[in-house]
């Protein structure tokens, strides 16, 4: 299954720009981990490595490309039991807006009064 996901990601990157040519494509699939890397001639670089840590996967990766405005973009991330987390991004990712006060109060009420069955 993880091979299919990695292959689908590689295919999506390759088809995103039909004029791009693959300069490098590497993949390694093991029982306890996987790794792949793709480099295209249009500045797109994608790398990902996953390791089985006990019962859970820990996936680390990076992506980089040049935007249509000719600005270099890069993202490094980790995905584990805590979810997807951006480790670094250039340019920085936008900060999400604060949670509205009414919604925050509702969340606090729900946490204080869990549903009973």
Curated annotation (Swiss-Prot):
The keyword tRNA-binding is assigned to this record: no
Ranges where the Chitin-binding type R&R domain occurs: 31-97
Function statement: Component of the larval cuticle.
Pfam families: Chitin_bind_4
Keyword Signal: yes
Classification via PANTHER family: CUTICLE PROTEIN (PTHR10380), CUTICULAR PROTEIN 47EG-RELATED (PTHR10380:SF241)
Any one of the GO CC terms: chitin-based extracellular matrix
GO MF terms held by the record: structural constituent of chitin-based larval cuticle
Keywords tagged on the record: Cuticle, Signal
Single GO biological process annotation from the record: chitin-based cuticle development
PROSITE patterns in alphabetical order: CHIT_BIND_RR_2
Protein source organism: Drosophila melanogaster
Protein's name according to its UniProt entry: Cuticular protein 47Eg
Cleaved signal peptide residues: 1-16
């Amino acid at each position: 299954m993880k091979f299919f996901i990695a292959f689908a990601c590689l295919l999506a990157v390759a088809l995103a720009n039909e004029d791009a040519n693959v300069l490098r494509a590497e993949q390694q699939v093991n029982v306890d981990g996987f790794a792949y890397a793709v480099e295209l001639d249009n500045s797109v670089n994608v790398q990902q490595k996953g390791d089985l840590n006990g019962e859970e996967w820990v996936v680390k990766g990076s992506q980089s490309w040049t935007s249509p405005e000719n600005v270099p973009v890069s993202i490094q991330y980790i995905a584990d039991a805590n979810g997807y987390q951006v480790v670094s991004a250039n340019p920085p990712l936008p900060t999400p807006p604060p949670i509205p006060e009414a919604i925050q109060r509702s969340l606090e009420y729900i946490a204080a009064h869990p549903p009973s069955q």
